[in-house]
Amino acid sequence: MEIAAEMSPLGDRPVSRRRLWIGLVVSIALCLGAGGLGAALTTPEINGWYRTIAKPAWNPPDWIFGPVWSTLYVMMAIAAWLVWKPAGLRAAAAPLALFGVQLVLNMAWSWIFFLLHRPGWAFVEIVLLWGAIVATMVAFLKRSKVAGMLLVPYLAWVSFASVLNFTIWRLNA
């Protein structure tokens, strides 16, 4: 068995490279799966309800959202993995719990905005999401500077999405 330089959460045994790679794959699958659940509700509404509502002139083209979100989900997954990797799940429980909260809020936004057609409610929810991302970034930065910095593009995109959400809400109120 090939041994990595990483130690177990208790520091008593080395962790195999295989386990580290499996952790990364699981992290990526979890994040992309969460994104897929949100997209499953979003996609049918892009050509339906979303086409019929007023949007600002600076609204990005629909095709840009898939690649941007896919990239962000992979970056989020790597960040979570970097927090989990050196210490394990028990030792990183608090920052990973925050990560889980923001991931659930991320999915919930799609449901509220696209499935329920409630831009006002979605705006309140995305503000909560923004706060959860900031809290996750702070917790991640304490464990890994790289992990925290990997969430910066996500925070920037959600900041933009918040302004877009607010504008759509006001245009259609």
What are these regions (language model features)?
Residues M1-R19:
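Short, Lys/Arg-rich, polar N-terminal cytosolic tail immediately upstream
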Residues N59-M75, L116-L129:
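Membrane-interface loop-to-helix entry segments
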Residues P44-A57, L171:
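Membrane-interface helix termini and inter-helical loops of multi-pass transporters
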